[in-house]
From Swiss-Prot:
GO terms for molecular function: metal ion binding; superoxide dismutase activity. It catalyses: 2 superoxide + 2 H(+) = H2O2 + O2. Homodimer. Gene3D superfamilies: Fe,Mn superoxide dismutase (SOD) domain, Iron/manganese superoxide dismutase, C-terminal domain. This is Superoxide dismutase [Mn]. The lineage of its organism: Bacteria, Bacillati, Bacillota, Bacilli, Lactobacillales. It is found in: Secreted. Destroys superoxide anion radicals which are normally produced within the cells and which are toxic to biological systems.
Amino acid sequence: MAIILPELPYAYDALEPQFDAETMTLHHDKHHATYVANANAALEKHPEIGENLEELLADVTKIPEDIRQALINNGGGHLNHALFWELLSPEKQDITPDVAQAIDDAFGSFDAFKEQFTAAATGRFGSGWAWLVVNKEGQLEITSTANQDTPISEGKKPILALDVWEHAYYLNYRNVRPNYIKAFFEIINWKKVSELYQAAK
């Protein structure tokens, strides 16, 4: 059994105009597929550790040293992208009441949350991700990670994710990352965010 590249839960062009079909095709079929292939290649060297990436990345010290960085990069890349696709919706959704209340409690207002999340996504130098997570205390927190690092490795449970690698937006938005972030907020799958939030609490 190997890690499998999940199919997108919608057509490649379903998120247009916010996310264009060419970017989605390259992002899923090339970038994500490469993370899956490289993660499988690393895992094949140590079949004794299994293939549960969430468990492995929750405590990277348990990953054999010769494949540790490869799994952080590629296992993380797979988990991050598999989650990211599910957090996007072709149909515009309103934020669910439970998540809206939790955001108000944690950040004061949705606008304050959006401003802080945007700052995390804009301020991530180079490649990485912006996240809304449930931390170890059960509280909402905004964070960002470099490269394909996952908040799971810090004991946090991601409920919203934004890929800020240039490959995620450059064809459509060029170097204007803030416009890409703004577009992201128009296509969030809030039902999925709520599902993850309820499971993480």
